[in-house]
């Protein structure tokens, strides 16, 4: 996800990032390193929670780690628990603003339809499809939703021994994206989005780079 796009949208709302969440270590079963990351990052972020701030994650995988995986690994750590209770996915956070305060005026129509992929790590957060809800705020948007696994699975999709399996799993999702024939393809997991884009490139139907939904909102604002 483009951190600059996220920053642009936040600034537009007059709202105001500590270390890796450790998901790559989790995928390699290095639980000791995940625990170290959780301890380090949670203590740093807790400084802001104590001041009344919320923590916003820019990718679905990071949000899943902070909200669910860290507390499972460290159930007796009060700071980790507090962090999980005060963490929001970026799409979730924007929708919280939209529902409570309303977004700042200025969202405009965009120059093509959007297929939004609701990534597995977003669905696992049990927050509903916030990416879809957020994109629906854009006037007259043509929006299609895909809720199937991209097959990437973090490092699973880039490792030589599992890459072919990742491609097989993702083929159906990529075929669905092709059929939608929209200009933009967005996913709240950047690796899933890029994987789908690579699988769909042979027909060149997905003409633009795979992006995060917040980048579509940024484009709608003209930022």
PLM region spans:
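Single conserved hydrophobic/aromatic residue that forms the stacking wall/gate
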Residues: 1-10
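Phosphate/diphosphate-binding loops
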Residues: 33-95
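Active-site glycine- and acidic-residue-rich loops that bind
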Residues: 120-131
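Short connector loops at secondary-structure junctions
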Residues: 11-37, 64, 92-95, 141-163, ...
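Short secondary-structure boundary/capping segments
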Residues: 28-32, 69-76, 131, 160, ...
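C-terminal structured "cap/appendage" subdomains that terminate the fold
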Residues: 157-213
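Short, flexible loop segments at boundaries between secondary-structure elements
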Residues: 77-106, 147-153, 204-223
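Immediate flanking context of iron-sulfur cluster ligation sites
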Residues: 11-17, 47-52, 139-148, 173-184
């Amino acid at each position: 996800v483009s951190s600059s796009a996220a920053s642009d949208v936040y600034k537009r709302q007059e709202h105001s990032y500590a270390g890796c969440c450790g998901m790559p270590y989790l995928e390699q079963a290095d639980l000791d390193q995940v625990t170290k990351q959780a301890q380090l990052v949670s203590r740093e972020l807790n400084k802001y929670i104590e001041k009344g701030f919320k923590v916003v994650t820019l990718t679905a995988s990071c949000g899943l780690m902070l909200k669910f995986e860290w507390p499972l690994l460290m159930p007796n750590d009060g700071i980790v628990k507090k962090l999980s209770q005060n963490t929001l996915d970026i799409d979730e956070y924007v929708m919280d603003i939209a529902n409570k305060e309303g977004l700042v005026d200025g969202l405009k129509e965009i120059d093509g339809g959007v297929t939004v992929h609701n990534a597995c790590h977003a669905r696992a957060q049990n927050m509903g499809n916030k990416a879809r809800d957020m994109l629906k705020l854009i006037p007259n948007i043509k929006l299609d939703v895909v809720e199937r696994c991209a097959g990437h699975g973090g490092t699973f999709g880039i490792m030589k021994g599992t890459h072919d399996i990742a491609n097989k799993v993702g083929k159906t999702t990529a075929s669905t994206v092709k059929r939608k024939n929209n200009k933009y393809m967005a996913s709240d997991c950047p690796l899933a989005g890029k994987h789908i884009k690579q699988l769909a490139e042979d027909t060149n139907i997905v003409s633009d780079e795979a992006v995060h939904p917040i980048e579509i909102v940024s484009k709608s604002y003209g930022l």
